[in-house]
Structures are given as structure tokens and as C-alpha cells.
Amino acid sequence: MSNIIKYKKKILNGDLLTKEEVEEILEEDITDLAATANEIRESLCGNKFDLCTIINGKSGRCQENCKYCAQSAHFDTDIIEYNILNSDRIINSAISNYNKGVHRFSVVTSGRALNNNEVDTLCKTYSKLKETCSIRLCASHGLLKYEDLKRLKDSGVTRYHNNLETSRKFFTKICTTHKYDDKIETIKNAKKAGLEICSGGIIGLGETMEDRIDMAFTLRELSVESVPVNILNPIKGTPLENQEILSYEEIIKTLALFRFILPTVQIRLAGGRTIISDNGKKALESGVNGAISGDMLTTLGIETSEDIKMIKNLGFEV
């Protein structure tokens, strides 16, 4: 019996793999690995696909120095900068996406964390949106304190997003203005406030597969509900502008391994899909059951109607 089949049976019996067991399947055939990851997804999660979209609610002028990010004030990138979008703009975007068939909508803001006035402004918007539209509300506003996270929950937000980005070991190579533990504290405070958690990272930063596996195990320890996997799309003007783009095989392998490590979560194909050959079709057959549709924060994405057609053709329910 191959290790893939052996560990699939273990997972379907309700057990979790150890890091050593995951390392035993690293060199297995990628096609077999992806197919088995998809079988695990279908058995434990069904065919329901979770589709979300985001809006850049505050752009640029960020004081953090994340090397991949176009919004950092430390780098010379050609992006539009603006403060918090007005309420009508956010609400209209949410309604438009809901009418297209999107399940979740997230306002994402630049900066280490929003200030009190900005939290107040967005909480009012979320409250209006909750009364106006049935789309599920997510938020991504940086390293907020518990009190602000509770205010978001009370205004209608159901899920908070804060990416770990990579492993603890590799994190200092991409950011030095805040710490890995700052992120973990925020995630724990969001859970304490009653929010679900969406947390994942970016692959292709120069990290190893071991780093990705370490991140996945940390996410498992944190009991997150959704794991977005972004593929680095190198941005001109950032320190990673010349970073080599990952091969599609490496992307598929990473997604499949994440399903083996995180058998019941929503694994969400996120940013960077436009740089792979088929908009992520093969990736969606590798254990994935969620995606961000539409444009990203500072880069173009996939049109939602195109996404839904592809997702349904793969046998998912949207």
C-alpha cells in the first residue's frame, strides 16, 4: 500500500497526520497526490464551494515593510493611495457581488491596524450592509485589539482575516516591522471575540516546502476555518520584483499537501491566479474548495461569471 493511500485512510478515519508522515509523501507523484487530496476534500467537505470577493477599502501608505506588498510606504510602487472608501461605494460593491453569486465579501485595509475613527466608520458601514444584503461579511484590518474585533462582530462581521504569510522561521526574511506573534495574538483575539478565522499565506516568496508545511501546521493549531493560498505575483518596485514565479506543479503540490494537513478547512485559492496557465482549474482539482474571485487589492483577478462557470463545470456546488 502506498503512503498516499495509507494516510488517506488515516485521515478519513478522523485522525490527523504528523509532520513526519507528511514528509513521507513529499516525493510522491504529483498527479496521485492531487487526486487523493481531492478525494479527501470530497469525502470530508463535500462539493460545496465557498466563493468570496474583496474590496480595497483603504489603499497604500502602509508603514509596515512586507517585501511582497505594493502598498508599503517603504517601496516605490505605482499604486493609487486613498483613505477609507465611503459607505455607499462599499455597500454597492457588496450588493453587486452578491447578485453575481458570491457568498462572502471582505473589506481589506492597508496599514498595521485601523485607528478608532476608522473602525467606527467601517462598523457603521457593516451595520448598514447587514441590513441591506445577505452576503456574509468578512474583514481584514490588520493587528486590531480585542475590543475593536468585538465591535466588528457586533456590527455584523462573521469572519476575520489575518494571514500568517509564511512560517515563523521565514517570516523575518519578509517583514521586520511586526512580529509573527503579533499575528497569532490577533487571530486568538478574533476567535475570543466570536469571529471565524481566515488565515493563510503567500507561496513563492523564496521559502521552502518545509516552511509551507510549518505554516500549515501552525494554522491547524490555531483551528482556522479558511486558509487562503496566494501565489506571489511579483510587483515592480518591491524587493521581490524579480522573484522567480513558482511552477504550476509546485503550486498544485502545495495545495494538495495542505489538504492532507488540514482535511476539513476551506482551502481557498487566492491571489496570483492570473499568472498560472488555466486560471487555476487544475489547482481546484487538488483539494481546494474555495476561491477569491474578481480583482485583488492591487492586481487584476478573474471575472466572477467566468469563475462560477469553471467551478460548476468541475462538479462543485456554488
UniProtKB/Swiss-Prot annotation:
Keywords, alphabetical: 2Fe-2S, 4Fe-4S, Biotin biosynthesis, Iron, Iron-sulfur, Metal-binding, S-adenosyl-L-methionine, Transferase
Co-factor note (free text): Binds 1 [4Fe-4S] cluster. The cluster is coordinated with 3 cysteines and an exchangeable S-adenosyl-L-methionine. Binds 1 [2Fe-2S] cluster. The cluster is coordinated with 3 cysteines and 1 arginine.
Catalytic activity: (4R,5S)-dethiobiotin + (sulfur carrier)-SH + 2 reduced [2Fe-2S]-[ferredoxin] + 2 S-adenosyl-L-methionine = (sulfur carrier)-H + biotin + 2 5'-deoxyadenosine + 2 L-methionine + 2 oxidized [2Fe-2S]-[ferredoxin]
Pathway membership: Cofactor biosynthesis; biotin biosynthesis; biotin from 7,8-diaminononanoate: step 2/2
Cofactors required: [4Fe-4S] cluster; [2Fe-2S] cluster
Domain of life, per lineage: Bacteria
A Pfam entry, by short name: BATS
Swiss-Prot/TrEMBL GO biological process terms: biotin biosynthetic process
Subunit and partners: Homodimer.
HAMAP family, per the entry: BioB
Protein name (Swiss-Prot/TrEMBL): Biotin synthase
Gene transcribed to yield this protein: bioB
